[in-house]
């Protein structure tokens, strides 16, 4: 059965049982009708996914892998902050009349910085180090740039990736691991979406650097379930986990910038029905 499902169920039960409520407090998020969007939250949630064992897509409900990869590449490959370059409309609420979300997410990825080796943006620096200095303990990205926060329509939720390379005993191939740091997460709408995105990213980076994907560690400072999501979460975690899907990444792609969503597939992906009409706090 899917290990990712069990991790998700345990996390949700922990939040519902041991979390704290923001009801009655001053909160920024609200529902479309103007009502404050309160949460039950848990501080410092850490989940670990061994990508060598399975791809961590939930079977409790379907995760739209093409759409989440499209968004991942929008940020990491296109380095864009314009929602018109996305196939989905997830970000429309935070875009201005021109489609821009300001100096957030992809904008920060395309900013070049001076290094001893020359000018590079954060993505190219990671790829350079993974190929030239894989055992460096300094391979990371960070898009939570304080001087630009006032020009971001949405502060980054998933804001930092740290990459770490190991070598298993008896193996000639290096293993690429990663830590995803997230300041805040809406568990129902975004948890598995983000997990699948960064699992794909690790697989992509590993492939183009001649490595194999290892462990993804997901650190969430504020993991929360919104008040109007509680019955939906309870329904979701009552379902029986199914076998994890098989992950396919086009082996012909050797350059990260050549990947498209069509180069990613989940095979034998059997899931429970989707939960529809999920209210989204803004």
For every predicted segment, state its role.
Residues 1-282:
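Terminal, non-catalytic protein-protein interaction segments that mediate quaternary/complex assembly
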């Amino acid at each position: 059965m899917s290990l990712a499902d069990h991790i998700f169920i345990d996390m949700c039960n922990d939040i519902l049982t041991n979390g704290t409520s923001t009801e009655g407090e001053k909160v920024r998020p609200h529902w479309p009708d103007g009502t404050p969007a309160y949460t039950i939250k848990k501080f410092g949630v850490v989940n670990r996914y061994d990508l060598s064992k399975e791809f961590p897509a939930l079977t409790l409900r379907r995760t739209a892998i093409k759409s989440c990869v499209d968004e991942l590449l929008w940020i990491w490959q296109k380095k864009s902050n314009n929602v018109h370059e996305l196939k989905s409309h997830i970000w429309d609420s935070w875009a201005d009349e021109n489609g821009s979300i300001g100096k957030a997410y992809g904008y920060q990825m395309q900013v070049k910085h001076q290094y001893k080796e020359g000018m590079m943006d954060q993505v190219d620096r990671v790829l350079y180090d993974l190929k030239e200095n894989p055992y460096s303990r300094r391979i990371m990205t960070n898009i939570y740039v304080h001087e630009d926060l006032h020009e971001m329509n949405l502060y980054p939720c998933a804001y930092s990736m740290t990459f770490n390379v190991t070598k298993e005993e008896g193996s000639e191939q290096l293993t690429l691991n990663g830590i995803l740091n997230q300041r805040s997460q809406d568990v129902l709408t975004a948890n598995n979406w983000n997990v699948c995105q960064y699992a794909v990213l690790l697989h992509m980076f590993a492939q183009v650097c001649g490595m194999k994907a290892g462990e993804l560690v997901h650190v969430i400072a504020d993991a929360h379930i919104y008040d109007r999501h509680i019955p939906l979460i309870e329904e979701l975690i009552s379902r029986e986990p199914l076998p994890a899907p098989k992950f396919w990444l086009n082996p012909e792609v050797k350059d990260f910038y050549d990947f498209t969503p069509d180069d990613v597939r989940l095979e034998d992906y059997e899931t429970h029905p989707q939960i529809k009409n999920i209210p989204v706090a803004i």
